[in-house]
Amino acid sequence: MNGVASTGMREAGIEYKLNFGVGIPQLKEIASETGKSSELAVALWKEDIRECRILAALVYPEDQFLPDMADLWIEQIRYPDLAEVCSMYLFSRMKNAAEAAFRWIASDNAITRYCGFLTLAHLLRGEREMGPRYVQEVKDQAEAAISGKDILCAQAAKAVLDRLDRDNG
């Protein structure tokens, strides 16, 4: 438990029902010791406790997690830290991740868009190939997000564009 970290998050407006301030490296270690389990992940997700939700994303078997479930989880994500963990460790590794991410970046909801851009950025880091039509669509959506008012979406969109530029010279 890290009271300083949880207090800092609370002061920044990140208010889970409970927040112990446990760091991601420690949670990853706990998840690796626990192993993958969809039942455990679902039970953990139901708690509005930061560490439980992060652990849920880390222990859910990626091959069993589907975009419909991701849509439900995204509706319940309120803070960027959880969006980042879910996008990196679960959403980008699920079946049909790219299709879901394209849908998310077109959403009116800022957290949903943020998850979409983060998921695409992680897919591109994983050397995932995208056809020219998809590349242009991502560029158009990313440029719109960068010129928008949502700083988090703009940063995630910039990461996607940077990755596309690096890969496509």
Enumerate the language-model features and the residues they cover.
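Alpha-helical scaffold domains
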Residues: 1-169
